[in-house]
Amino acid sequence: LDNRPVNDLRVEALADSTGMNVLLPPEDLYATRLDGQTTNANGTQYGDTHALLQWVLDNEDACDVLIVSMDQLLSGGLVNSRWEDGTDLTWEKDAIDTLSQIAARKPVYVFDTVMRLATTAGYQGLDSEAYRLFRSYGMAERGELTGHNLTVDNIIAGYPYGADGERIETTLDDELVEHYLAARARKLRLTDYLLRHAESFAACVVGVDDSAARIS
């Protein structure tokens, strides 16, 4: 997911305790840097997705099993997956296809997440108030979709609207809201594509981050 100790140091320690040898990419390739921290070598606050995929390819033969965070590989980390809003997903889909091909040769375990309600405070200029506002906005109940209406495109089209069909009100800047919704759309499309390849992998696990017990 990123370079927080629970995601790398503790994983290595746990593996060592069982006699397993874990290979991790250089930290600079997967580190998340908050505002005010020194950026990675690629000049960003997030991991280097292209370099990470190349690292996987270069080290495939040295591994018996691959365990891959899709948020890291496709978005440069969990935090950036809540911010990245690109619409051209050609490279990301090709990366999933590449993992599927590797999975035909050895076990590949992939882990993904459903994007949480809020963005991250202290990242890309967002603060705790933005976190609160985004969480409230994301928690608003949306309309229910069933049957043939339950499609990725329809889910995305409904993001700006509440269960009553009216646009959800917020004091957030319109540009920030559009960015947030675009990030959600991107994340959903990538998870949908991943799940369509789920049978290729030894396991495909999708975790649910901060969420609401309603259609949101």
Model regions and ranges:
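An N-terminal assembly and electron-transfer interface module characteristic of large anaerobic redox
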Residues: 1-216
